[in-house]
């Protein structure tokens, strides 16, 4: 506690908020709530008393939101908007940062598109950061994660595409490896019932720029490369930023012959898996 109080005091002295580190440390140490001060950037006046400065740090309304949070399944368009909002930059500046694939460290197998390569998590933005430095951290996080999980560079993009679909279709951990198996089975089933088509709503929605909901008929009829009801195989890129759980599910899918699944209880998320369309129709009736 003493060192953290001293560190904060020194920062405040350097910024002209308080005159004396010692006075701030004394105030810090006799205030039990001091330990709840969160890291971050705060708006404080200059030339405050030690007690006033400490009170200012304990008031969350003075904390400037400098965190960019990426959640599993979030689209790159949503991440871009967050960068614009938090960093106070323009959309054009963010687009330019994403376009400089070398500067953000985007591997060549991504094909120039960072969708799926922005590791979910919280990123604290400092005054020294630019859109490029922040995006580079997100990309490096994904590269490091894939390396840690033993994914060969040649397989990275395919794994991220599949994992992003798993996340798009399923948010209950126990079913993720089963959904991953459905993807594998459908890709292999080129001459069977599903004719190699994934038929996944999450990809259809992505193709028409929707982030959630259920596709309507116009969405299902929209002929774009992400419409896996019209096109066999995988979509050209991931459809969001995949979670580590989804990536692990893709790397180790459950054993099974399923080609279909349907959630039968929206409250519990209970999902039934089927190997034939006939079986799927029976499950749908539940």
Describe each region flagged by the PLM.
Residues 88-89, 104-286:
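Bacterial extracytoplasmic/cell-wall-associated proteins, especially those involved in peptidoglycan
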Residues 1-146:
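Signal peptide-directed extracytoplasmic domains
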């Amino acid at each position: 506690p003493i060192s953290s109080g001293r560190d904060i005091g020194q920062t405040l002295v350097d910024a002209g908020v308080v005159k004396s580190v010692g006075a701030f440390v004394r105030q810090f140490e006799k205030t039990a709530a001091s330990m709840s001060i969160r890291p971050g950037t705060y708006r404080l006046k200059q030339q405050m008393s030690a007690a006033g400065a400490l009170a200012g740090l304990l008031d969350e309304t003075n904390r400037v939101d400098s965190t960019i949070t990426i959640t599993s399944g979030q689209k790159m368009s949503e991440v871009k908007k967050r960068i614009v909002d938090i960093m106070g930059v323009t959309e054009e500046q963010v687009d330019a940062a994403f376009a400089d694939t070398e500067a953000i460290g985007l591997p060549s197998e991504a094909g120039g598109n960072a969708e799926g390569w922005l590791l979910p998590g919280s990123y604290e933005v400092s005054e020294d950061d630019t859109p490029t430095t922040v995006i580079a951290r997100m990309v490096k996080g994904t590269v490091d994660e894939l390396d840690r999980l033993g994914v060969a560079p040649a397989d990275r993009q395919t794994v991220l595409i599949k994992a992003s679909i798993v996340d798009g279709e399923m948010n209950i951990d126990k079913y993720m490896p089963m959904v991953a198996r459905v993807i594998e089975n459908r890709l292999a089933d080129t001459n069977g019932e599903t004719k190699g088509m994934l038929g996944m709503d999450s990809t259809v929605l992505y193709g028409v720029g929707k982030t959630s909901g259920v596709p309507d008929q116009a969405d299902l009829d929209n002929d774009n490369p992400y419409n896996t009801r019209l096109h066999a195989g995988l979509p050209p890129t991931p459809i969001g930023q995949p979670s580590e759980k989804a990536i692990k599910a893709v790397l180790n899918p459950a054993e099974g012959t399923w080609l279909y699944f349907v959630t039968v209880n929206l409250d519990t998320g209970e999902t039934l898996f089927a190997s034939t369309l006939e079986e799927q129709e029976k499950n749908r009736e539940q």
